[in-house]
Amino acid sequence: MSTWGQMNLMDPASPIQIEMMLFHDHAMAILIGIFTLVSCLGVKLCFNTLSTRTMHEAQLLETLWTILPAFLLVWLALPSLRLLYLLDEQSSEGIVLKAIGHQWYWSYEMPSMNVSSIDSYMIPEDDLKPGEYRLLEVDNRPTVPYGMDINVIATSADVIHAWALPSMGVKMDAVPGRLNSMGFHANLPGIYYGQCSEICGANHSFMPIAIEAVDVKDFINMCN
């Protein structure tokens, strides 16, 4: 999870988040290269006293500054499109977790496991136990098995919310009257935190998301 003063991304806990971090590093390398080149050219031009009034065209230069940016855009676009399609992929055999946004809490259902609605409210700061996190802990955490595909379906009962779990690489709008879906695959057991990522009213900051990933056997025992 995020910590105070953190300068990098959260540790990835799913394959799709690993892919996102790789694309981030790929894009940053290209951007740093462009920034360095433009900065060096700008400094050189500031100190360059040579000029010419007879040169009206430079075919080679014009060709280069047309082809190179186009090549860089393609170099960015191809992995971006691949990642975009990966985000939309979902397993037909994945466990369905339905998240319903309310002002200002979440409720969850797991139809395939016969789990009825679970309301998940933020634990007030005065009720936190030692070691628990302010504004992130909830009274009821939905449990999912790690190492298996999870298909999350998000909707809302009132206004627009957004269900986000950064370490899993998941963020999607929860819109009234509409079902949005994304999948994730937890690589490791643990508790993963997120928050509503769409301003939804006065208590928008107080509707956290907490998901617990456990072993498959433990998950089956909990459902039974």
Curated annotation (Swiss-Prot):
Sequence intervals crossing the membrane: 27-48, 63-82
Gene Ontology molecular function, alphabetical: copper ion binding; cytochrome-c oxidase activity
Alphabetical GO biological process terms: ATP synthesis coupled electron transport
Top enzyme category: translocase
Membrane topology recorded in Swiss-Prot or TrEMBL: Multi-pass membrane protein
Binding site for Cu cation A1: H161, C196, C200, M207
Keyword Transmembrane assigned: yes
GO cellular component terms, A-Z: mitochondrial inner membrane
Gene3D superfamilies: 1.10.287.90, Cupredoxins - blue copper proteins
UniProt cross-references to PANTHER family, sorted A to Z: CYTOCHROME C OXIDASE SUBUNIT 2, CYTOCHROME C OXIDASE, SUBUNIT II
Protein name per the record: Cytochrome c oxidase subunit 2
Organism, as annotated: Albinaria turrita
